[in-house]
Structures are given as C-alpha cells and as structure tokens.
C-alpha cells in the first residue's frame, strides 16, 4: 500500500457496514459507514476539481467544526490529489484569538491556498483576497445534489507530500510539518502494534480531527485495521465527559484511542461528582493510550475511581510522540506494565540521574515505554550521545520522521541533521531501555547556575496542595535590569477562598518550594 486513499477503498469493500459513529450529546448520533464515507468523499473530490477548479497538489486548509464535515473534506482532498492542511475551526468574530492568529500565520507561510471554513464572515474576508475561500455549507449542498460523476484519482508516490499539519509544539511560531504517505502509513503500522489492535476491536475517542492524535492515531488507525470508530465530538466531551464512559459501556469498547492527561483529569472530576455510574461496565477495555502532554506521576492514583467500574490498570498506556514524527515514538507495551521511576532531586537539578532509596528527596516520572519498531531514539547532550541514566535532549530517526517544515529551511535545518530530529524534549533511558520524559529544553528554569524543570515543581505543588490548587504552572524570564532569571508561579484554585486565605496559601507554597529546591518564586 503506497497511497492513503487505498485505506478507505479497502475498508469500503471489505467491511462496508462498519464505519464511524459520531456522538453529539445534544443531537442524535450519526453513523457513517465506510462505504458511505468513500462515496461522499469521491463526490467531494469531483466538486473540488470541477466546481472550484482545484488542481492536484493544491494546498487546502480545512478549518471546520463538525467532525463529519472535516473527515469528508479530508478524504475529498486526498482523492482529488490535493494536500489537506489541518487547522482548528476559526471564528472571524474572534480575531484576537490564538486560533485566528495561527490561521493567518499559516496562510502567510503556505502562499496561495484554498480555505474551507464554516464561518461565513471568515469566508467573506478571505474570498476578497488572492486566496480562494469556500464555505463548507456550499460544498455539502452540492454533495446532496450531485448524482452522476466520474473521478480520476491522481497517482501519488509513497514519498510524496500527503498532509501539512501546523504545530508549534510547546514553543515558537506555528510551523507546517510536512508528512508523506509513507510517514503516515508506517506510523499506523507501529501504532497498531503498540495498541494490540485486531479486527474484532472497537475504538472510541474524543480528540479533534485537526490533531494528529484524532486523525492519525484514531481515525486512520481504525481504517487501517478495518474496525468501527466511535467519535465523540470534542465539545460534547467537554460538556459531559461521562459520555465517554457511557459509550464505552454501551458498546463494550476495547480500545480507548489517544487521550490527554488533562482530559482524563476532567473525566475523573465529573466521575467523583456523579452517582449515576454504578451500572457502567469498563471491563472490556484492553488499551487506553495517554499522550500529547506530560503525564503526572500521580495519574494512577487519580484514576482509581475507574478501577471500581472494572477498568484494568494495565490498560493504561502512556506514550510519547509529536507531529514531527507523524504521531507515536514510544509506548508502554503489553507485558511490560507501567512504571514510575524515582530519582534524586538534588542530583537531577545538576543534570545527573541517580536512583533513590525511600529516605531521599526524589522526583518521580512516568515511563513513556519502549521505542517502537522502525524508530531509533538517542539522548544527546552538547552534541554527544549519552549512555543510559544520563539526561539530555531526545533525538529521533526513522521512516516516520517528517521531511521538514513547509517553506522554512532555517527551522528545518535547526532540527534535522543527518536524519536525526532534535525534539527539544529532555529525557533519559533507564537500564532496561525504558524512556522517560522530564520536560522541554527551552522551558528549563536556571537559578544560581542550576537547572530546574517546571514539570517537577508543578508536581510537587499539586501533591502538597492538591485540595486547594487545581492547576499550576512555573515559568521564568530573564531580567536585563537585574541580570538574572525571575521565577513566576501561576495557579488555579480548586475551591473558593478569601483574599486572606489566598495570601496564606501563596506563603505556604513559597515556603514549601524554597524548602524543596532552595528558592521561592518572586511572583
């Protein structure tokens, strides 16, 4: 298999009655079979080519809200031989939003593009420029009317550009990650291995399709394995996270597609407040992939309410990856279990990984698992590859690694050298070649010549003050007037407090951090 559209063609022929169940908790669920998805996508490809005059390898930004429309447009672009550019839905009325700014930056980088949007004001704004703007509702109306059509799908090579995904990672301006057909198909293969997916499985997820986890790690994985996908609309999940568990129980789902620690935390909060969950059965779940964010060390403690519903602790699979590697790089594989590691905090801040006994002050990190087949990972410090239990930057090499950033040779050259991708993430291997992620290189806080990692500081605060503080962030900036780093601490309260109580909490937090690491935040 060399071309992405072959996934849909095969699924439509071999399992025509399987498909995507799109769950919206304010409306009736929608089931779209793979046969229907193929037929509608082919029609959209014809509409794009004949009515909107798009040419093969044209770049088409998909910025629409509804999952059904997004996935139809994605496949329509692929079958028209175009290059879909994945972006979140943007509202013109909110021109000060990060999403709108990212869209403008993406268009500047891409040059002449076709923008498909569900926002009529955004459509009017861009149709008057040299770009081509298309309203998704117009395409869907033509889709309903189109009867007779013929489609020639342009032949594409496995190394050709397939998708552009704009991702700024944790820092920096948005960059267009260029992924080939081979990048994506290779990652689908190793994702299938990591999650032990078979043709008997059903997968559920709530991640948006513009995210690599939502599109590659969930939708395309379902097509690759010819299984049914249950897609909960993201806004439906945020409104009622328990719908995720209810659908798992209702359909006896076996695979929970990639989700985030913050999403799971939101789910647990609602679960703890609900009395209407006793009849739920989660015992069929064999895999729940966790990624896209740093995984907190107390995750398994927080998720204990799920175990009372039959959820298997070994189903949790922390993983590691990024847009630049298509999706997944490592995962906690079956049979190896999930493992936390404790290391000496003082040594860690000096860049040394030293295992601790129970009496020592420690940092704790969650395993990101083993490196998956076909990929190489090394830890590098000052340009020198490191041995196990040495901290450094994570570099990745393999068939899933992007070819570069679109129209950005400088940024590409900064991160890609001799096939090795510098991720900007810091981590280390233990003696069993298990990978651990400790933070971002650019986010390291330097105080008095020592390196401190925000994720560890945040974990400390949440473990100590979890009843009062819901979310917390540490960061810093360099003050040229004082010629030193200024440390900032932000947090969100988990309950109402008076001004006096808040001041007392701040003082207690500062004293606690000072005792732990030798300095206190100044703001």
Model-derived features: positions:
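ANL superfamily adenylate-forming
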Residues: 96, 100-104, 111-158, 165, ...
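AMP-dependent adenylate-forming
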Residues: 7-33, 161-164, 171, 321, ...
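Gly/Ser/Thr-rich phosphate-binding loop
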Residues: 253-258, 270-361, 376, 383
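Conserved pre-ATP/AMP-binding loop-to-beta segment of ANL
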Residues: 16-18, 147-166, 172-173, 183, ...
């Amino acid at each position: 298999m060399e071309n992405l559209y072959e996934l849909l063609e095969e699924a439509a022929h071999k399992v025509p009655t399987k498909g995507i169940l799109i769950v919206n908790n304010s409306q009736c669920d929608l089931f779209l079979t793979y046969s229907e998805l193929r037929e509608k996508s082919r029609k959209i490809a014809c509409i794009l080519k004949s009515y909107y005059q798009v040419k093969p390898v044209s770049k088409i930004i998909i910025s629409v809200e509804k999952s059904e429309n997004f996935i139809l447009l994605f496949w329509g672009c692929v079958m028209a031989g175009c290059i879909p550019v994945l972006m979140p839905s943007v509202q013109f009325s909110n021109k000060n939003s990060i999403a709108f700014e990212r869209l403008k930056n993406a268009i500047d980088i891409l040059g002449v593009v076709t923008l498909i949007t569900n926002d009529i004001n955004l459509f009017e704004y861009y149709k008057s420029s040299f770009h081509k703007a298309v309203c998704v509702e117009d395409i869907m109306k033509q889709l309903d009317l189109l009867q007779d059509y013929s489609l020639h799908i342009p032949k594409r090579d496995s190394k050709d550009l397939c998708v552009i995904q704009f991702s700024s990672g944790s820092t920096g301006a948005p960059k267009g990650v260029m992924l080939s057909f081979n990048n994506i198909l290779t990652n689908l293969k190793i994702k299938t291995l990591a999650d032990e997916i078979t043709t008997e499985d059903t997968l559920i997820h709530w991640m948006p399709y513009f995210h690599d986890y939502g599109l590659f790690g969930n939708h395309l994985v379902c097509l690759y394995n010819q299984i049914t996908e249950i897609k909960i609309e993201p806004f439906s999940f945020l409104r009622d996270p328990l719908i995720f568990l209810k659908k798992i129980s209702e359909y006896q789902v076996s695979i929970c597609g990639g989700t985030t620690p913050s999403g799971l935390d939101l789910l647990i909060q609602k679960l703890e407040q609900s009395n209407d969950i006793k009849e739920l059965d989660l015992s069929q779940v064999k895999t729940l992939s966790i990624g896209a964010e740093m995984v907190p060390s107390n995750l398994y403690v927080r998720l204990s309410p799920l175990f009372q519903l039959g959820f298997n602790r070994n189903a949790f699979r922390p993983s590691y990856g990024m847009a630049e590697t298509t999706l997944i790089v490592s995962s906690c594989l079956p049979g190896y279990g999930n493992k936390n590691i404790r290391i000496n905090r003082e040594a860690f801040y000096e860049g040394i990984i030293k295992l601790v006994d129970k009496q020592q002050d420690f940092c704790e990190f969650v395993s990101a698992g083993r490196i998956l087949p076909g990929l190489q990972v090394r830890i590098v410090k000052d340009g020198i590859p490191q041995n196990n239990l040495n901290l450094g930057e994570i570099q990745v090499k393999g068939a899933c690694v992007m070819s570069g950033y679109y129209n950005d040779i400088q940024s590409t050259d900064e991160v890609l050298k001799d096939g090795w991708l510098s991720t900007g993430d810091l981590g280390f291997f233990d003696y069993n070649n298990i990978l651990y992620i400790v933070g971002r290189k650019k986010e390291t806080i330097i105080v008095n010549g020592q390196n401190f990692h925000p994720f560890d500081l945040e974990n400390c605060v949440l473990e100590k003050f979890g009843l009062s503080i819901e979310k917390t962030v540490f960061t810093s900036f360099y003050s040229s007037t004082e010629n030193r780093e200024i440390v900032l601490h932000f947090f969100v309260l988990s309950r109402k407090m008076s001004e006096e109580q808040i001041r007392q909490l701040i003082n207690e937090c500062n004293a606690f951090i000072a005792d732990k690491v030798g300095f206190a935040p100044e703001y």
